[in-house]
Amino acid sequence: MAKELQKWVVMVTAQTPTNIAVIKYWGKRDETLILPINDSISVTLDPDHLCTTTTVSVSPSFEQDRMWLNGKEISLLGGRFQSCLREIRSRACDLEDEKKGIKIKKMDWEKLRLHIASYNNFPTAAGLASSAAGLACFVFALAKLMNLNEDNGQLSAIARRGSGSACRSLYGGFVKWIMGKEENGSDSIAFQLADEKHWDDLVIVIAVVSARQKETSSTTGMQDSCKTSMLIQHRAKEVVPKRIIQMEDAIEKRDFPSFARLACADSNQFHAVCLDTSPPIFYMNDTSHKIISCVEKWNRSVGTPQVAYTFDAGPNAVLIARDRKIAALLLRRLLFHFPPTFQHCLNSYVIGDKSILQDVGVQDMKDIESLPPPPEIKDNIPAQKSNGDVSYFICTRPGRGPVLLPDSGALLNPETGLPK
């Protein structure tokens, strides 16, 4: 290893999106390899609005592997981080940086220590798949740093070892994670069904009901469901295989009514499995249920689905509108039913693609107060408003997969390898 005595630092920075499953992954047949009991399908969300940025660095001056998440140092000793690190280090190749005059041999990677900094631009551990983006970015960035030859499909099998849903964040657009049949998990990988441009009419509105960490982690919840729920096996064997075929067809044909019905039904069944678990798991709350009711009433009044809803392991609603016009009508309804409290300003209550507010006809907080009730609310039923039940809304769309960022986007100091 050249320049052993010099304090050089080599860094790579990557950005990876999160994803939301429309056919859910819930339950593992192997806890160590993280092998699922069913296939799943997801939509990758635009990383301009929801993503993880990770900088990985290596230097002979580093004394130990260290990691910082959202500015706070965390332990890298966890099994999932270590599984990914071992897999990537075993596949590392020679690296040469001609500008810095640095050569790292394949055998040197085992000796060199790493510094890693990661930042989520959305709530961590609140049911917005932050672990998916985080572990996918961890693997993608390390693979680039260590000059791996593996493609994203092969990297997805490594990311899966860190977080199951992370394997789906290595692609943009619509992604399928195959459960596989091999005991060693070699065929349990993700691949892209269609890119983000395939169905670019879709608009996604996320209602962040709670940014707090959930009481029951996904890992614990899955274990409990597999041990105690009778519904989960029926779901995995009888229901999901048919829905996977139907969802693939709906995505290929851009058939929104079928897409919406499948997404809503699968979300509801996933949460039914959680309720069928002993002790029961409550990821959704009253606000989640109110949002479902709002969407269902609207869809029924029109006669065909305008919006799909799906909830991961948390109370936050991911609402998928068939086009921008419908998305504006959706946000209009959401702002009517879930107006902000007086502490909010519009700029922080609706984030992401704020241009949709122009379509809604809302320019300030007073405009929200004057919104009329949606037409599906009957005249004889008073319109209920739930002020403060939603923390904020994120407007986004299907997005691209992971990318490398220039050095200017690094989270670590290029001289010291410590957080900026």
UniProtKB/Swiss-Prot annotation:
Gene3D superfamilies: 3.30.230.10, GHMP kinase, C-terminal domain. One of its GO terms (biological process) is isopentenyl diphosphate biosynthetic process, mevalonate pathway. It catalyses: (R)-5-diphosphomevalonate + ATP = isopentenyl diphosphate + ADP + phosphate + CO2. Performs the first committed step in the biosynthesis of isoprene-containing compounds such as sterols and terpenoids. Component of the triterpenes (e.g. ginsenosides or panaxosides) and phytosterols biosynthetic pathways. Promotes the accumulation of stigmasterol and beta-sitosterol. Its EC number is 4.1.1.33. PANTHER family: DIPHOSPHOMEVALONATE DECARBOXYLASE (PTHR10977:SF3). The keyword Lipid biosynthesis applies. One of its GO terms (molecular function) is ATP binding. This is Diphosphomevalonate decarboxylase 2. Homodimer. It comes from Panax ginseng (Korean ginseng). GO terms for cellular component: cytosol; peroxisome.
